[in-house]
């Protein structure tokens, strides 16, 4: 058997240091989660919260990027996804640092006794309307269960004074969340606009918000270059995770 076929298992996705099984998760490993996990600022991070963790992908990426004392809590509403995330964590090198909770994050936040220096979320972004094929996928991608206002409420309750709240969203949804956040007193600190290639406008945005003002760093990135190969910027961002790079 080819070593590549042995590594690229059909029920999930193999990264350099861990494997993500996602066959029981509504949302599979995708570009958005990988970008957020590789991009979120981790300097001086003490404790991390991943809201809507799904398969546990972003939590494990952040575990790889942070040092031994850092603890990571991952909260996921769907029972099957949370169970699979727990299994993925248990099979990883960071099982002692990543803790998966199956819970509604709005209720969980009310009883949480910790604050976090980094909160990340790849949140729902479709408004109610047409529904997905499965109720689990609807929950994962439609704001009927977790609106952006509710997400900001949770982040405000749980964030450290000098912490960062990071999300990835489609460009239009990101603009709306950013407007809501600024109205509530958040400050934009980092923003990366992402285009599929250099002939198209940005269709995703990475945002890092903080309760505290500070220098703004704004940039942009394309995922693929004119030759349809991954761009140098994308390769630099994700090289610690993707195989064969």
Swiss-Prot record:
GO BP annotations, alphabetical order: methylation; tRNA processing
Cross-referenced SUPFAM superfamilies: S-adenosyl-L-methionine-dependent methyltransferases
GO cellular component, one term: cytoplasm
Compartments, as annotated in UniProt: Cytoplasm
Enzyme Commission numbers on file: 2.1.1.223
Reaction equations catalysed: adenosine(37) in tRNA1(Val) + S-adenosyl-L-methionine = N(6)-methyladenosine(37) in tRNA1(Val) + S-adenosyl-L-homocysteine + H(+)
Signal peptide boundaries: none
Keyword vocabulary terms for this entry: Cytoplasm, Methyltransferase, S-adenosyl-L-methionine, Transferase, tRNA processing
Main location: cytoplasm
MF terms (GO), sorted A to Z: nucleic acid binding; tRNA (adenine-N6)-methyltransferase activity
Domain of life: Bacteria
Record's function text: Specifically methylates the adenine in position 37 of tRNA(1)(Val) (anticodon cmo5UAC).
Sequence similarity: Belongs to the methyltransferase superfamily. tRNA (adenine-N(6)-)-methyltransferase family.
NCBIfam families: tRm6a37MtseTrmN
Protein name (record): tRNA1(Val) (adenine(37)-N6)-methyltransferase
Organism, as annotated: Erwinia tasmaniensis (strain DSM 17950 / CFBP 7177 / CIP 109463 / NCPPB 4357 / Et1/99)
């Amino acid at each position: 058997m080819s070593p590549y076929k042995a590594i690229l298992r059909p029920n999930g996705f193999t990264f350099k240091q861990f494997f993500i099984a996602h066959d029981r998760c509504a949302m599979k490993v995708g570009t958005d989660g990988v970008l957020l996990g590789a991009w979120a600022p981790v300097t001086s991070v003490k404790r991390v919260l991943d809201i809507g963790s799904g398969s546990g992908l972003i939590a494990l990426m952040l575990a790889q990027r942070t040092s031994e004392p850092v603890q990571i809590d991952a909260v996921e509403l769907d029972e099957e996804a949370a169970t699979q995330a727990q299994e993925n964590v248990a099979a990883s090198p960071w099982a002692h640092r990543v803790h998966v909770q199956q819970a509604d994050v709005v209720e969980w936040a009310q009883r949480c006794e910790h604050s976090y220096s980094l909160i990340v979320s790849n949140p729902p972004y479709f408004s109610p309307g047409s529904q997905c094929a499965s109720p689990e996928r609807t929950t994962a991608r439609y704001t009927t269960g977790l609106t952006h206002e509710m997400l900001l409420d949770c982040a405000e309750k749980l964030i450290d004074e000098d912490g960062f709240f990071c999300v990835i969203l489609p460009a239009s949804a990101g603009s709306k969340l950013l407007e809501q956040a600024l109205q509530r007193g958040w400050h934009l600190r980092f923003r990366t606009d992402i285009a599929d290639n250099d002939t198209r406008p940005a269709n995703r945005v990475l945002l890092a918000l903080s309760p505290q003002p500070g220098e703004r760093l704004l940039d942009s990135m394309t995922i693929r270059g004119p030759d349809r190969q991954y761009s140098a910027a994308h390769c630099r961002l994700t090289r610690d995770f993707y195989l064969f790079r």
